[in-house]
From Swiss-Prot:
One of its GO terms (cellular component) is cytoplasm. This is Ribosomal RNA small subunit methyltransferase C. It comes from Escherichia coli O7:K1 (strain IAI39 / ExPEC). It catalyses: guanosine(1207) in 16S rRNA + S-adenosyl-L-methionine = N(2)-methylguanosine(1207) in 16S rRNA + S-adenosyl-L-homocysteine + H(+). It comes from the Bacteria. Specifically methylates the guanine in position 1207 of 16S rRNA in the 30S particle. The lineage of its organism: Bacteria, Pseudomonadati, Pseudomonadota, Gammaproteobacteria, Enterobacterales.
Amino acid sequence: MSAFTPASEVLLRHSDDFEQSRILFAGDLQDDLPARLDTAASRAHTQQFHHWQVLSRQMGDNARFSLVATANDVADCDTLIYYWPKNKPEAQFQLMNLLSLLPVGTDIFVVGENRSGVRSAEQMLADYAPLNKVDSARRCGLYFGRLEKQPVFDANKFWGEYSVDGLTVKTLPGVFSRDGLDVGSQLLLSTLTPHTKGKVLDVGCGAGVLSVAFARHSPKIRLTLCDVSAPAVEASRATLAANSVEGEVFASNVFSEVKGRFDMIISNPPFHDGMQTSLDAAQTLIRGAVRHLNSGGELRIVANAFLPYPDVLDETFGFHEVIAQTGRFKVYRAIMTRQAKKG
């Protein structure tokens, strides 16, 4: 994160207004403006582990990562700058959480790209902090209001649930495939062999559906799940518990917090980070897998057919197979052999 996003560039047009403010930055924090903007004091709260990694290097303990912000996270702040995400329920979860903690009279700024639906912030906050649009540039809108009433926030009311082939899947706003199993994951699941054994790592686990479905027909696997998203980590833990499946779940930026080697790594890797297209996570996954696979171990991922992963797989593993495909998706398989680069 070095170049500023369009949303941050709009905020910089008003930088003089923030010099005396004690600011809490939250939402879709795609760059390091929270660490660089000239303010009286700055804090940041994010649900994205990779964003926290960048900000904490510059802000220390003033950058926090968690599903739910606490009173300590917003202490002494008189201004909220909220970056609108692409997901409206995610925005509602985060804003209701933050506004329930901030004191009445807090200045509220909401900024985001028009295509993300930032306009709906006005309606969402109408009862708590009526907003007015104060700037429009770089295809973004900047809205300002003042907190008049704190909402009541109950994180439990945001949980969702659905069933897949008799399995219970727990979800939260911001979790991939929140409303049902996506087609890509269905295709990947169709390729998993029953009675598999060994250590399995699910990278970018989302709500945990891949892992619990795999464990149902391969009960002897030992599961580890990770994701950059705090909602995904909590949803996966809840999904495992709901299906009486054991596994370790933690936040990690691809392999950043992963220790040891595995017999199989499975993933439906993301190719968006917020509103931005990004292949970084998937390429990091493929290249880093060789440092976390046992000899003979396997990487199995599903991806949109148009994405350029075959070259990275061949470069890293020496070869790959396509073991299932539809018009839109392909499931790739690569084996850890002597040909594979050792990272």
